[in-house]
Design a protein with these regions (language model features):
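Active-site recognition of the HExxH zinc-binding catalytic motif
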Residues: 79-92
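An amphipathic alpha-helix signature
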Residues: 78-79, 110
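Conserved glycine-rich acetyl-CoA-binding loop
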Residues: 75
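Metalloprotease/metallohydrolase-associated module, dominated by Zn2+-dependent proteases
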Residues: 2-72, 95-193
């Protein structure tokens, strides 16, 4: 069996990105940097800023696929990638597809997703976030042999331990502060310890 590496997983995702771009965006989406990082509470995310510097004059957007979710079937990973590509499409076309700091996916996101080969379903408080592959996406996956792509051999679920963050409250003005260990603080507003 071939050894699974971060670079091989990223290369497979880049191939998916190219296939999806050609099939659902007529190849018009700019290249993006595909990253693999653990994203708590999400399968992936799109970064609206061009945070990756390629050279002096070229910067690129980032699409992250959560490394903790790479054990899912390739079709589900492709649906997540397409979900983030729809955000990219909306961003470069000045379509405001989310609110509540990018959490709530509105009807404009739904329309863009449906127009670009993705099925989305409503989830209370989050909007049109439940992503499922359409028949067109399933067909593209078969045509491009995505079912044979295995992005992760074995990922283990883990339960996070108790948080080490503490919340401190000024007894006079109510100002709050968080710290990861016991600290001696003085309130900057009312100067009380």
């Amino acid at each position: 069996m071939n050894k699974i590496t971060t670079s091989s997983a990223a290369a497979q995702l880049e191939r998916m990105y190219d296939d999806l771009n050609k099939a659902f965006f007529e190849g018009k989406l700019p290249d993006a940097i595909i990253t693999l990082k653990c994203t708590k509470g999400a399968y992936g995310h799109f970064t609206t800023g061009q945070i990756w510097r390629v050279d002096e004059s070229t910067h690129k957007h980032e699409i992250n696929i959560s490394s903790a979710t790479l054990d899912r079937p390739a079709l589900q990973t492709a649906a997540t990638l397409l979900h983030e590509m729809v955000h990219f499409y909306c961003h470069i076309n000045n379509i405001r597809d989310t609110s509540n700091h990018g959490v709530y996916h509105n009807h404009k996101y739904k329309e863009a997703a449906l127009d670009h080969g993705l099925l989305v379903f409503y989830v209370k408080y989050y909007g049109w976030t439940n992503t499922q592959p359409s028949d067109a996406l399933r067909l593209l996956a078969v045509e491009n042999a995505w079912p044979q792509i295995k992005l992760a051999e074995d990922t283990r679920s883990y339960t996070a331990g108790p948080s080490s963050t503490r919340k401190y409250l000024c007894p006079q003005c109510g100002l709050t502060c968080r710290a990861t260990k016991k600290v001696n603080l003085i309130c900057g507003d009312c100067k009380l310890p």
